[in-house]
Amino acid sequence: MAAKMRAGLTLMMVCLSATAMAQTPPAAEPAKVIRLPDIRMRDVCILPDQASKTYYMVGPGGRGVRAYTSKDLVNWEGPRMIFQAPDDFWGEIPIVSIWAPEMHAYKGKYYLFLTFDTRNKFPEQWRNWLPRVTRGSQVLVADAPTGPFKAFANHSTLPVDMMTLDGTLWVEDGVPYMVFCHEWVQIKDGTVEYVRLKDDLSATDGEPIRLFHGSDAVWLKKSEQYGCYVTDGPYLYKSKSGKLFMIWASHSQTGYTTGIAISDSGKLAGPWRQQAEPIYTKDGGHAMLFTTFDGRLMMVLHSPNGPAARPRIFEMEDTGETLRITKEFTAPSQP
């Protein structure tokens, strides 16, 4: 009898232990840490989040946005998906991919500026030309940099009959604007344009205004196949001199290239002039600028411009007349 009681107690303890184990939630997997040189991602943007003293680096991931976080720009945790486009995001127009995400903190909210690509053809198509399709920049909003991000509408923030990409935020005299590219696929000579936004960035408040054509830059190489001029990735920075600088990308004799346009008036409306010499010519571009928590001006771009693209960070100097690279920011060697 005693043996049966002991066996029964043992069985009960095993069952209770199994029940307790089943009710215990699994331990969270430790965050994956990866060093900057080992990250493979293009069209990157880094937001120094003042609230958390954390750097958020975002980039495209299929129909979503990937994010890494870091405290030192060397060791990064991630990636994690902070946004994934639902099947019906643009109604009956399927989203194929997301390009060039940017994250901005503005008036207590976090915003993603995204380019959505589709295969939905416009009525007008050209012979021996790439498909002219629905493609546009759109603003999403969240209360935190990790989301959830929500759209204001089920279509591009910019006019839906324009092929637009690489939208970025610029605030001048308290007024928000989107600066973006009107794609060469639609107009042959790509442009950089701007449009005023509503105060909550939910929609445009006016019509787009052209700032310059790609062909305005003497360093830009016209496409031999299409005879076009590409404009990519505008990003703005107010110089200590009061001038307004815009870095942007296209192709030159050496590959993907980052150039700089300058508004001597310091105003977004310009007029804009193109610096003859680009600031980066080693097959890298789609750059943006940010300031570290200790006050250093940095530029991040992707290079090379192909499947092996990775983020590269450079320390910059604002001379008052232009921007120039002083050195590449590199991760210290591991012991």
Map each language-model feature to its residues.
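Bacterial N-terminal signal peptides that target proteins for export
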Residues: 1-9
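Bacterial N-terminal signal peptides
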Residues: 8-19
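Carbohydrate-active catalytic/glycan-binding domains of CAZyme proteins
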Residues: 23-335
